[in-house]
């Protein structure tokens, strides 16, 4: 699976109409109408997201590996 930074994943979410609700420290919290879950993305410079976190957030946002 392709590695992606938190900043790049945030851009991807915003392209898919996820809205930044708040920022808590270095974590950005996104929400979308029609979804109960929130997506929390850690922004630590340009460090890539851990694989487990990335897969879990992709599942919530309904993003496939091809869309990265």
Q: Where in the sequence are the language-model features?
A:
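Active-site beta-strand termini and strand-to-loop segments that position acidic
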Residues: 30-34
